[in-house]
C-alpha cells in the first residue's frame, strides 16, 4: 500500500495461489488493486491426502518427526488451472475488470506428470470456463 500510494504509475503482478495461501480472497484482493494490475498468475492448488505410515507416526524420534512434517507440509499441491480449490472464473473476471492484460498459467510442480500434459489440462479447463478466445 505504501508503494502504491507513492508510485501510482507502477503496475504489478499478482499470484492467485499465494494471495489465497496468505489468507486473502484473490477476487477481493484483485478488486482492491484494480487499475494497477497488469499481469495475473493463474496458479491453482489442491489439498492432497497425507500419507500415514503403517503403524502410525513415530513422534519419539527425530526421523519420525521429520517424516511427519514433510508429509504435513507437502499436503498442499499445485494443480492445473481449474483442478484445484480456487474459483478461477471469478479470479479471471476480477483481473479483466481490474485492468489485467496478461494472464499466465503457472504450476510450480507437476508431481511426475509431463508439464505439457498439465498445460493441456489447464488450457482445456480455461476453454470450458469460456476463455477459449485467448488461444
Regions found by a protein language model. Give the residues of each.
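Acidic/histidine-rich catalytic cores of soluble enzymes
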Residues: 1-79
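Alpha-helix N-cap and loop-to-helix initiation/capping positions
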Residues: 2, 76-83, 114-121
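Residues at alpha-helix caps and immediate loop-helix transition turns in enzyme cores, especially N-
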Residues: 25-26, 87, 115-118
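A short, acidic, amphipathic alpha-helical segment used as a generic capping/interface helix at domain edges
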Residues: 83-96
Amino acid at each position: 500500500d505504501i508503494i502504491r500510494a507513492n508510485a501510482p504509475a507502477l503496475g504489478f503482478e499478482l499470484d492467485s495461489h499465494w494471495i489465497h495461501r496468505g489468507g486473502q480472497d484473490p477476487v477481493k484482493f484483485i478488486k482492491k488493486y484494480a487499475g494497477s494490475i497488469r499481469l495475473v498468475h493463474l496458479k491453482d492448488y489442491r489439498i492432497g491426502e497425507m500419507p500415514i505410515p503403517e503403524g502410525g507416526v513415530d513422534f519419539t524420534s527425530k526421523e519420525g518427526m521429520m517424516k511427519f512434517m514433510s508429509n504435513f507440509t507437502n499436503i498442499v499441491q499445485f494443480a492445473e488451472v481449474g483442478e484445484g480449490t480456487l474459483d478461477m472464473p471469478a479470479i479471471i473476471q476480477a483481473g479483466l475488470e481490474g485492468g489485467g492484460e496478461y494472464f499466465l498459467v503457472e504450476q510450480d510442480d507437476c508431481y511426475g506428470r509431463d508439464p505439457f500434459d498439465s498445460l493441456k489440462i489447464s488450457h482445456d479447463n480455461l476453454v470450458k470456463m469460456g476463455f477459449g478466445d485467448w488461444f
